[in-house]
Amino acid sequence: DPLTGLFNRWQMYKRLETCISRYTQHKLQTLTVAMGDIDFFKHVNDTYGHDAGDEVLRTLSRLFRTIMDKKGYVCRWGGEEFLFLFPDMDMDEVQLLMSDLLDDIRHTPVLYERKLIHVTMTFGVEEFGRNHTMESVIQEADRKLYLGKESGRNRVIY
């Protein structure tokens, strides 16, 4: 993705395809997907302008790259949505990482034109299982993301 430096959607599809293949061949024990969305991002753009919104996306992307280093993959799925992929990470590890990620996002203000912009994110997490397809695991993570939005935002739904 040119703005964030993260994988784009197409690159992540390829990565996910490879991981699913490894999972079905029993080369991976677990495979978990998380869909995340910046809460009230439209408000950031409307209040501070689209350049500020771009800076929020870049700042969070740098944070994601640091956190995800050697743990998994992250891409900008579109707009203010991000998809995370955790191969061979058990659910306890995923929950700990997601909890840390929520805290880090909350405590990483974005400096734009001498103003600090604070954002939060909501996530939906789904573990890949034998009855999933690539599309269905993403759809289920996305469905859980929207449950999190409906139940107050700034949270992770498993």
Q: Where on the chain are the PLM-derived regions?
A:
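A short pre-motif secondary-structure segment
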Residues: 73-76, 117
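Active-site-flanking beta-strand signature of metal-NTP-handling nucleotidyl enzymes
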Residues: 32-37, 74
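Short catalytic/binding micro-motifs of nucleotide second-messenger systems
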Residues: 22, 66-71, 103-115, 145-147
